[in-house]
C-alpha cells in the first residue's frame, strides 16, 4: 500500500518485471512462480514494464496477469499504465500489447496495442481501444492520479450481458458453418468414390 505522498518501485525476477506504484495504491502479489506472475491492484495507479522471457525448462513464455475489481489484464511483454478505482479500470499501452477482459466474463476481451487505451466499468464490456494523442499519453504517464484517464474520450461500452450473448451467437454460427463444411466435404468425397 502506498500513502498520499508515497510511491514505490517493485522489481521482480531481476529486471524482467518492474512495477511503479503511484500514490494511494493498493497492490498485492498473489503468485510468483516459474510459469507466471499474478498480481492484484484493487485501487490506485501503476506503470508496468514487463519483459517476458522463456521459462528454460518448459520452453514457453512466463505469464504475467493483473487483476482489478473489474478487469483481468493479460500482459505480453509490454509497458503500460493502469488506473483503477474499484468500479472502473483504465489502461494505456506504451509498448507491446495488453489484453483486457471483464472479471465477470473473461471471454469478452479486447487487445490494446501501443498508443491505445481502453476502459472497463462494472457491468460493461471493455471499450473498443482508442488511439490516445502523445500529449495526453504523457499526461497520463506523469500524473499520480487515475483521474487523467478521464481526459480520454472513450467510446461507449456495450453491456456485458449483451456482449456475452453476442459472443455465444457468433460461436454457435461458427460451429454450424464448420459442420456444414464438414458435411459438404463428406458429400464431395462420396461423389468422388462413386
Give the role of each language-model region.
Residues 1-178, 182-183, 188, 192-194:
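Flexible, surface-exposed loop/linker segments and immediately adjacent secondary-structure boundaries
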Amino acid at each position: 500500500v502506498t500513502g498520499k505522498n508515497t510511491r514505490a518501485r517493485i522489481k521482480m525476477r531481476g529486471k524482467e518485471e518492474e512495477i511503479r506504484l503511484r500514490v494511494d495504491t493498493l497492490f498485492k502479489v498473489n503468485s510468483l512462480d516459474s510459469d507466471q506472475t499474478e498480481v492484484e491492484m484493487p485501487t490506485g495507479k501503476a506503470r508496468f514494464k514487463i519483459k517476458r522471457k522463456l521459462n528454460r525448462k518448459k520452453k514457453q513464455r512466463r505469464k504475467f496477469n493483473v487483476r482489478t475489481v473489474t478487469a483481468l489484464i493479460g500482459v505480453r511483454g509490454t509497458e503500460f499504465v493502469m488506473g483503477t478505482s474499484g468500479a472502473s479500470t483504465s489502461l494505456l499501452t506504451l509498448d507491446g500489447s495488453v489484453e483486457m477482459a471483464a472479471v465477470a466474463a473473461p471471454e469478452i476481451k479486447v487487445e490494446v496495442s501501443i498508443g491505445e487505451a481502453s476502459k472497463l466499468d462494472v457491468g460493461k464490456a471493455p471499450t473498443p481501444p482508442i488511439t490516445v494523442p502523445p500529449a495526453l499519453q504523457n499526461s497520463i504517464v506523469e500524473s499520480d492520479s487515475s483521474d487523467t484517464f478521464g481526459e480520454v474520450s472513450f467510446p461507449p461500452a456495450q453491456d456485458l450481458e449483451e456482449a456475452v450473448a453476442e459472443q455465444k451467437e457468433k460461436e454457435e454460427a461458427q460451429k454450424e458453418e464448420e459442420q456444414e463444411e464438414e458435411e459438404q466435404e463428406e458429400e464431395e468425397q462420396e461423389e468422388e468414390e462413386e
